[in-house]
Amino acid sequence: MSELLLGVNVDHIATLRQARGTNYPDPVYAASVAEHAGADGITVHLREDRRHIQDRDIHVLKQTLHTRMNFEMAVTDEMIAIACDVKPVFCCLVPEKREELTTEGGLDVVGQLDKITKATEQLTAAGIAVSLFIDADKAQIDAAVASKAPYIEIHTGHYADLSSEEEQLIELERLTVGIKYAHNLGLKVNAGHGLNYFNVKPIAAIKEIIELNIGHAIIARAAIDGLDKAVRDMKQLMLEARTYNT
């Protein structure tokens, strides 16, 4: 059985903090709890508008994490400079629109290949492993290879949004084909967006996936059950998906 890693996104702890402009709840403390419960890494998205995660969070997490930071960022000069200063283990390049509630789709690597290749080169030179958040589209996957990014994160949001089981199965097959295609080209494949306790197992069973990044569902469950239990429950579902599909 291949190991499947869990990256816990703590952005929504910061969202709750920013709603009142207080210094609590602290995403840094939440990251520590998540690590204790079995998280293999912590994901944070420093958005240009600073709507949740703040610069301070990134710097303190860098000093305190026992696992590794996955720093989600737009492809801008400001974010590249911050990443090169902080030097997280991973940077995931994502599309970003100020008016969106959350990331709405994958990065258009095909249409921005030169820009993304340059950013990848800069981040790689700083010792950071680069991932591109993309849809399971062959053209985008081919462009990711051309950019020299070693990792991709496949966008699972459309799969997660579908309510029909039949439609979900069709989308799951599309994702699986794309993930296997990327893996065969030598890319290391992660996945995430919209995954929760009810839809994670079919994705977790795809053996080419190295890591799932999950945030909103875990933080929402934590509001009821507590963060430690929420992380442990998600890890158990992922383990079951791999155990029963070997």
Swiss-Prot record:
Record-given protein name: Pyridoxine 5'-phosphate synthase
Catalytic activity, per the record? 3-amino-2-oxopropyl phosphate + 1-deoxy-D-xylulose 5-phosphate = pyridoxine 5'-phosphate + phosphate + 2 H2O + H(+)
> Per its UniProt entry, which superkingdom is the organism in?
Bacteria
The residues that the entry says bind 3-amino-2-oxopropyl phosphate are: 9, 20, 194, 215-216
Going by the UniProt record, its keywords in alphabetical order are: Cytoplasm, Pyridoxine biosynthesis, Transferase
Gene this chain is encoded by: pdxJ
What Pfam family is a match, any one?
Answer: PdxJ
Keyword Cytoplasm assigned = yes
Please state which protein family the record places this protein in.
Belongs to the PNP synthase family.
UniProt site (Transition state stabilizer) = 153
Q: In which pathway does it act?
A: Cofactor biosynthesis; pyridoxine 5'-phosphate biosynthesis; pyridoxine 5'-phosphate from D-erythrose 4-phosphate: step 5/5
- Active-site residues, record numbering mapped to chain: 45 (proton acceptor), 72 (proton acceptor), 193 (proton donor)
Q: What is its main location?
A: cytoplasm
- Which regions span the lipid bilayer? none
What is the purpose of this protein? Answer: Catalyzes the complicated ring closure reaction between the two acyclic compounds 1-deoxy-D-xylulose-5-phosphate (DXP) and 3-amino-2-oxopropyl phosphate (1-amino-acetone-3-phosphate or AAP) to form pyridoxine 5'-phosphate (PNP) and inorganic phosphate.
Q: Which InterPro entries match?
A: Aldolase_TIM, PyrdxlP_synth_PdxJ, Pyridoxine-5'_phos_synth
In its UniProt record, which GO terms are filed under biological process?
pyridoxine biosynthetic process
UniProt keyword Ribonucleoprotein present: no
The residues the record assigns to binding 1-deoxy-D-xylulose 5-phosphate are: 11-12, 47, 52, 102
- Fill in the subunit field for this protein: Homooctamer; tetramer of dimers.
Any one Gene Ontology cellular component term annotated for this protein: cytosol
| Localization per record | Cytoplasm
What's one GO MF term for it? pyridoxine 5'-phosphate synthase activity
